[in-house]
């Protein structure tokens, strides 16, 4: 088996409310709307993030986005009105955690020098 790409799914209760959050998070509208209750953003490496309506699973998703410069990303997100709920620095990564309106966890992570 050869894996050629990945799609991460995030379950939300209200797609309209989620669109507002994720458009600010990614800094642009969705790249695709395959169905009325779905929105997809393509990431620079080719992977996709899909936000979709699933009231039973809303709030239980976790998405980690690896960035080159966490401080720069936090500045961009602050301009969009998004503030992290927590920040941490470990031996391998610096992280900042956000929550979408349903409580899904979005983690921005920057590798520490020499770890990856």
Where do the language-model regions lie?
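Conserved active-site tyrosine of GNAT-family acetyltransferases
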Residues: 18-23, 77, 103
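N-terminal beta-strand motif that seeds the catalytic metal site of vicinal oxygen chelate
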Residues: 1-19, 46, 61-65, 112-116
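Secondary-structure boundary/capping motif
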Residues: 13-21, 38, 48-50, 97
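Vicinal oxygen chelate
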Residues: 5-13, 55-116
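Conserved short beta-strand elements that form part of the metal-binding/catalytic scaffold
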Residues: 28-61, 105-111
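Conserved acetyl-CoA-binding loop of GNAT-fold acetyltransferases
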Residues: 24-31, 81-83
């Amino acid at each position: 088996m050869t894996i050629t790409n990945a799609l991460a799914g995030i379950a939300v209760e209200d797609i309209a409310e989620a669109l507002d959050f994720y458009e600010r998070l990614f800094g642009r509208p969705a790249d695709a709307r395959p169905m009325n209750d779905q929105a997809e953003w393509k990431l620079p490496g080719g992977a996709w993030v899909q936000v979709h309506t699933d009231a039973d699973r809303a709030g239980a998703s976790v998405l980690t986005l690896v960035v080159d410069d966490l401080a720069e990303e936090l500045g961009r997100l602050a301009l969009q009105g998004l503030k992290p709920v927590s920040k941490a620095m470990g031996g391998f990564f610096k992280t900042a955690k956000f929550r979408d309106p349903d409580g899904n966890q979005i983690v921005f992570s920057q590798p520490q020098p020499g770890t990856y």
